Amino acid sequence: MTDGATVLVDFFYAQPVGHAVEALHHALAVQRADPSRRVSVLLNAATPVELASCCPWLDRAYAVRSPFLEPAPDALAALAHVPRDWDWVLDDPRRHQPVQRESFAGMVDHYAASDAWLRPREGRRPLGYPPPSRSRHEPLRLELPAAARAAAAGRLPGRGGPLVALLPAGSGPAAQYPSARSWGLVLDALREALPGLGVVLVGRRVRDERTSTGMPAADLARLAAHPAVVADVLDVPLLEQLAAVQRCGLLLSPHSGFGMAAMAVGTPWLTLSGGRWFEWWFDHVPFRSVVPDVRRFPAYSQFGAEATVPDGDGGERVPSMVRERVQADLHRVVAAADELLRGAVPYERCLDDYVRDLVAAHGGDASALWSFDDVHREHLPGRLGG
């Protein structure tokens, strides 16, 4: 039975790419449950709203320009272009979490204004808590425009060996990611183990309202000069970068929302896991997360305090991203890259292995874990295979 409802997914959150992907995945889940629905999404204008153009099933995307961290006294005026009347309004459950409300004053102001502005006929509810119905664990695929795919093809060399995209840092401070020297060790090991491999460097150096790569420009230049690097797409438009990643056999990076976007174009993601956040989004694409030995290299503090320690490269870094940790896991990174490039590991096994490792990293306490659509729960140790 269909309902033909109009639905607005109100997802005003932080700027990183991964949160735009998350919002679109929520919208997809609602639309796939009833294709007669007209589903739209509201996003922070500082996030990559253009990703919505890659979702032909989406009705509209509304970019709202309003502060996120700081108070937003004009939050109501910022909503003037958003239609008021909907059947359902579904919003990000984070708006109700005390730690989020204490940290992000602009988010609080946005949702207060949104509550006043929008007039849902059927109701307003947190995403993930029907009604309305939603389809669980749907694969999200971004349909990149032909112009972006053509531009990417022109930027990458024609060659016979496998290509690996490298994003050396997410959008946090540089201390949360490996140094350029540590990444050089990784590229040396990959080049030795996988003859003919070429690396495509991705990232964004521009400093504006959007997120950018948390590695100094000089270090990015140092990486770009590594013998394994055959091309870079630094600073090209996001959809062109994703089109370049789509032509690669995998994306290698630390934890980053860009990795979610890579999987949404069908590219496997190999993560040097650690830092504040573990990987929590799974999209029917093979992946590997190399989880650190947290007894030696503590990780996954989330909103908690995060100490730094001296790195072998002369600076300070979070423990799970120091050179010693990278060296300790080089063999695991190489093995994971090899199996992903060969297509040798199925998606379900990736989930089984990752959830097992993540539970172990949390001292066996699975209650500390979470994931989009709670996908991890079906892969907890003791439930494998049934």
Task: List the predicted regions and their residue ranges.
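A structural signal for short coil/turn segments at secondary-structure junctions
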Residues: D34-P35, P56, R159, L194, ...
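Generic beta-sheet signal
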Residues: L42, V64, D92, V202, ...
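Active-site donor-nucleotide binding/catalytic segment of nucleotide-sugar enzymes
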Residues: L8-F11, D92-V108, A151-A218, G275-W277, ...
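Conserved nucleotide-diphosphate donor binding/catalytic pocket of glycan-assembly enzymes
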Residues: L58-A150, G160-A169, P173, R276-V285, ...
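Hydrophobic anchor at the start of a short beta-strand
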Residues: S36-S40, L163, L197-V199, P268-L270, ...
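Active-site and donor-binding regions of nucleotide-sugar-utilizing enzymes
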Residues: T2-R119, E240-L242, G259
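Leloir-type glycosyltransferase catalytic cores
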Residues: P120-R155, V285-G386
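Donor-binding and catalytic core of enzymes assembling or modifying cell-surface/extracellular glycoconjugates
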Residues: T47, Y177-G275, E279
